[in-house]
Design a protein with these regions (language model features):
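Active-site helix of classical SDR
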Residues: 133, 170, 178
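Residue(s) in the substrate-gating loop at a strand-loop-helix junction
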Residues: 153
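Short C-terminal tail/terminal secondary-structure segment
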Residues: 2-6, 158, 202, 244-245, ...
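Canonical Rossmann dinucleotide-binding motif of NAD(H)/NADP(H)-dependent dehydrogenases/reductases
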Residues: 6-44
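A conserved structural motif in NAD(P)-dependent oxidoreductases
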Residues: 229-240
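Substrate-binding pocket helix/loop in short-chain dehydrogenase/reductase
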Residues: 109-110, 114-122, 225
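Short, small/polar-rich loop/turn modules that mediate ligand/substrate recognition or access, typified
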Residues: 186, 191, 255-257
Length: 271
């Protein structure tokens, strides 16, 4: 990753969910773990799969002086999420920054999508954010403050080329959830913001989305996605991570209840 001024998060503890990837490369959670570690944060990396976090751990441990601990958790289960927060405190003593990054889509409109698939989409993309905030907010309040960055998607604000009503609804709800919590906890020195990635080139695109939307043809899917972006190229997890870093840092001390769209201009097109 590119070189930046070091130490913007020195002494801070980051808890990031969805810190693994389905393959090599820069997923959002992996990039957040690495980028925040580069800036001095101690990283508590969480994913449902320990194997998915192996590259994340290796990349962070390659940074001189970096500290990282991994933890497996099903973030749709309240008891496991509470245990996740407790484990982070046991290891690092506190949680200064929470980045909720778990997410995944399922194709289908209200007729095609099964009720079971709908429930899973809401649990995975929205309930996970609710539970993590539910258990971290009292801790941050007791600590005297903190910063939360929730990851939504341009699917939550625009049509992005495919019917995925469960995913889009959940991500739209994440945006409004963040606004409500931001106002409620502003006087407690807890900032809550949302980063909204667009159609990024991440490991999940190649491993899963190509099969859902382009008959397994990765190049065709990448071409479709890139054609929608005014800047003419797709970003990756590092772009999402840099946006989250700004929102989590003291540089954003006067920003709460806001959304930062990272999509190369895609969402402002009208064609």
């Amino acid at each position: 990753m590119s070189q930046h001024t070091q130490g913007r998060l020195a002494g801070k503890v980051l808890l990031v969910t969805g810190a693994g990837c389905v393959g090599p490369g820069w997923g959002n959670g992996r990039a957040v773990a690495v980028r925040f570690a580069e800036e001095g944060a101690k990283v508590f990396a969480v994913d449902k799969s320990a194997e998915a976090m192996e590259e994340t751990l290796a990349r962070v441990r390659a940074i001189p002086g970096a500290q990282i601990e991994s933890h497996t958790c099903d973030v749709t289960q309240a008891s496991e999420v509470k245990g996740m927060i407790d484990a982070c405190v046991a290891r690092f003593g506190r949680v200064d920054i929470l980045v909720n990054n778990v997410g995944g889509s399922a194709r289908g409109g209200p007729v095609d999508l099964t009720e079971e698939a709908w429930d899973k989409q809401i649990d995975f993309n929205l309930k996970s954010v609710f539970l993590a905030c539910k258990y971290v907010l009292p801790l941050m309040e007791a600590q005297g403050g903190g910063a939360i960055v929730n990851t939504a998607s341009t699917s939550g604000i625009r049509w992005t080329g495919a019917a995925q009503v469960g995913y889009a609804s959940a991500k739209a709800a994440v945006i409004q959830f963040s606004r409500v919590v931001a106002v409620e906890y502003a006087k407690k020195n807890i900032r809550v913001n949302t980063v909204i990635p667009g159609q990024m080139h991440t490991p999940m695109v190649e491993a899963r989305l190509a099969g859902q939307r382009a008959g397994g043809n990765v190049d065709a899917l990448l071409a479709q996605r890139q054609a929608r972006i005014p800047l003419g190229f797709m970003g990756d997890g590092r772009d999402t991570a840099n946006a989250a870093l700004f929102l989590a840092s003291d540089e954003a001390r006067f920003i709460t209840g806001a959304e930062l769209i990272v999509d190369g201009g895609m969402s402002v097109r009208c064609d």
